[in-house]
Structures are given as C-alpha cells and as structure tokens.
Amino acid sequence: MDEFDRDLDNELEFSHKSTKGVKVHRTFESMRLKPELLKGIYAYGFEAPSAIQSRAIMQIISGRDTIAQAQSGTGKTATFSIGMLEVLDSKSKECQALVLSPTRELATQIQNVIKHLGDYMNIQTYACIGGKNVGTDIKRLQQGQQIVSGTPGRVLDVIKRRNLSTRHIKMLILDEADELFTKGFKEQIYEIYKHLPPGVQVVVVSATLTHEVLEMTGKFTTDPVKILVKREEVSLSGIKQYYIQCEKEDWKFDTLCDLYDNLTITQAVIFCNTKIKVNWLTDQMRKQNFTVVAMHGDMKQEERDAIMNDFRSGNSRVLISTDVWARGIDVQQISLVINYDLPLDKENYIHRIGRSGRFGRKGTAINLLTKSDTIELKALEKYYSTKIKEMPSNVNDVM
C-alpha cells in the first residue's frame, strides 16, 4: 500500500463544530490500541494516521457519536474499522457492530478491510448483501458474526426474519451517508435503527455531507463530534482535471478510441450515466478490438464480483461503469478517470474522479463534452471552486 501524501493530507481543513480541542494523534502508538490491532494496522500497510484517522479514531473509541467527512482516499474506512475493532469484545460471538453501505461492492470491500485489520484478533465479520442466497446469510449469521457489513435492504430483511440479533449491537456505522440517505435507503435505515438498542453509538462517514444529511443524522445522533472538510477542498487536490470538446455526442466515441493507448498505462475507469450506455459503449469498444470490461447494477452479484476481482488484480485495465462503481471502491492502480457523460448529480463528480487519486497519489480526470455540456461543466467548477482546463493537444503531457 502506498503511503499517504502527507503534504496533501495536512492541507485538509477541519472544523469541529460541536466540540473544541479535538486531540490529534500523530501516531497509532499514541492511541494505545490493542497490540493485536496495532499489528494488523501495520501489516495492512499503514505507517502513520491520516488527517481524518488522527482525529476521528479516538472519538469513535471514546463512544462519541461521530460525523466524519474527508477526501476520498484518505482512509475513512480504516478510520471507523480501527475504532470499531478496538472496542469490540472478541470473546463474545454476538453481533456488536453494524456497517451500512449503499452498494454491495462497497459492503464487501469494508468486510475485507475489517478482516485484514483484525487479522490477529479472531474477529468474525460477514458481508450481508443482496444478490446472494438469503439461506447462505442465515447460515453464516447463525455461526456468529461480531461485525456485519451490509446493504440496508438485505440487513433489514435478516433482522425482520430474526436471523440477525440486534440486542448486543453497540455501534452503527453509515458509510457514504449522502448516498444512503437518498430516496429508497432512508426509510430502510430508519427501520433498522428502530430495532437497535437505545443509546447505540452512531458513526456517519462520507466524502460529501450535505446540509440535508446533517439534518437527518441529527434525528438519531446525540451531541456528535463533527470532523468536517470544506466542500470545495474535498477530493480535488492532486487530481488534474481536463475537458475535451467533442461538439456532437457521436464524436465522443472516436475521441475515446484515440485516448485508448493512454488508458492502459496503469488502469482507467470510464463512467456513463445509464446501463444502456455502458452496454452500448462496451460493445462498440470491443468491435474496434479494444479490451474493456463493464459493470452496472443489473448484473448478477457473481458476475460483478468476478469483474471486480479481475480489475483489482490488474488482469483487466479498462472498466466501463455506471455510478454504482463510483463510491468508495478502492483500487490502488487507477490513475485515470474519464467521464463519457458528466454525472447527473454534482455530488457524484467528486466520487467519480476521486478514484484516480487514491491515498494522495496524483491522478487525471478527463471530461468528454458536447456543446450542451458546457453549462454543466461551469456549474461543476463553481460548485467545487475548481478550474477544469481544456485538454492539451499532446496527451502525453498530462498523463
């Protein structure tokens, strides 16, 4: 694992709105964590806490409700995972912590991070997600899982079936909270929360936190410590952003083909707004003998898992996807993101291009525009207080 870009990481501005004097822990040793957890942290590849980790981990361990926002790729998942692992009772086989995520892939990735960090702790964790046989979930839950990472629909299902006991849950984590609180997830989360014991600790984590999300989390948090980054400073530092004017929609494909040789230098993700567009673009690229893989929400879970594993391992170099892939999926080698379509939701821009600069590395984002996209590009620049430049004629100058 690459080290954090310490200069970039230290630029993040934190505003502790509900409390003053949040202590900053510059080393993991200063947190006085369990020796076996500390061993897992170092084995995973961390050397020193990132800005969010140095502030939020101890707040979580202390039992405070915590709202944490930080740049994509600064170790938010490890932040709540370390806090959670420190306070769990490894001798009890009851479920003690519940993590909710907006996508199956993210829930599975969180499970893997927890497994690695808790490698020396004898902690059982399980990804409870849709797309899998519920019978398998029931069997695994009956074996005893101290941490469950899942999607709201499936988690609520196993709670209602009484296959997941909530009596001993002391921590609820909402990851990528802004997406979780969109229509469809909000009601399920409230329903899950009603089944949890009174006084359960709530940890809210996201790269972006809207005013609406902060309002909603206020309904089930008590005097939370807020560790926030100003919106315009989130996730864009260290990522070079460009646009290519294509005039017509039809010209985008030719432009993408011209860029293909540069896509495979490391790994690249191409985002489209619809599943139909993903399938169409994948077919067109393959007809031109370009090697690409595709992923969207209509695929079976086994197929999505296989594609993710291939992409993680580097066997496939170019992935075409909808926004199902944009949030929190951690593949270290990605250095280029192409927005074939500008995102429909401004908040998703940050999640998409944040993939290209994981853990403080430098990345490049290229936006393919038609004339009608120009207004939306200007709106993105204003929203994030950033400047998106026109792509130089020599692509090698920016890659």
From Swiss-Prot:
Major location, coarse class? nucleus
Under the heading PANTHER family, the entry gives: ATP-DEPENDENT RNA HELICASE DBP3
- Ligand binding (ATP): A70, Q71, S72, G73, T74, G75, K76, T77
| Comment text on domains | The Q motif is unique to and characteristic of the DEAD box family of RNA helicases and controls ATP binding and hydrolysis.
- List the ranges annotated as motif Q motif: 26-54
Which positions does the motif DEAD box occupy? 175-178
Q: Which organism is it from?
A: Lodderomyces elongisporus (strain ATCC 11503 / CBS 2605 / JCM 1781 / NBRC 1676 / NRRL YB-4239)
Instruction: Indicate the segments forming the Helicase C-terminal domain, all copies.
Output: 238-399
* Residue stretches making up the Helicase ATP-binding domain: 57-227
Q: Which UniProt keywords apply?
A: ATP-binding, Helicase, Hydrolase, Nucleotide-binding, Nucleus, Ribosome biogenesis, RNA-binding, rRNA processing
The family line of this record is:
Belongs to the DEAD box helicase family. DDX48/FAL1 subfamily.
Task: Quote the protein name from its UniProt record.
Answer: ATP-dependent RNA helicase FAL1
Q: Which CDD domains match?
A: SF2_C_DEAD
Q: Methyltransferase: is it a keyword of this entry?
A: no
GO MF terms held by the record: ATP binding; ATP hydrolysis activity; RNA binding; RNA helicase activity
Q: Name one GO biological process term.
A: maturation of SSU-rRNA from tricistronic rRNA transcript (SSU-rRNA, 5.8S rRNA, LSU-rRNA)
What EC number(s) has UniProt assigned to this enzyme? 3.6.4.13
Q: What does this protein do?
A: ATP-dependent RNA helicase involved in 40S ribosomal subunit biogenesis. Required for the processing and cleavage of 35S pre-rRNA at sites A0, A1, and A2, leading to mature 18S rRNA.
Organism classification: Eukaryota, Fungi, Dikarya, Ascomycota, Saccharomycotina
Gene Ontology terms, cellular component aspect? FAL1-SGD1 complex; nucleolus; preribosome, small subunit precursor; small-subunit processome
Q: Where in the cell is it found?
A: Nucleus, Nucleolus
Name the chemical reaction catalysed here: ATP + H2O = ADP + phosphate + H(+)
**InterPro entries this protein is in?**
DEAD/DEAH_box_helicase_dom (IPR011545), Helicase_ATP-bd (IPR014001), Helicase_C-like (IPR001650), P-loop_NTPase (IPR027417), RNA-helicase_DEAD-box_CS (IPR000629), RNA_helicase_DEAD_Q_motif (IPR014014)
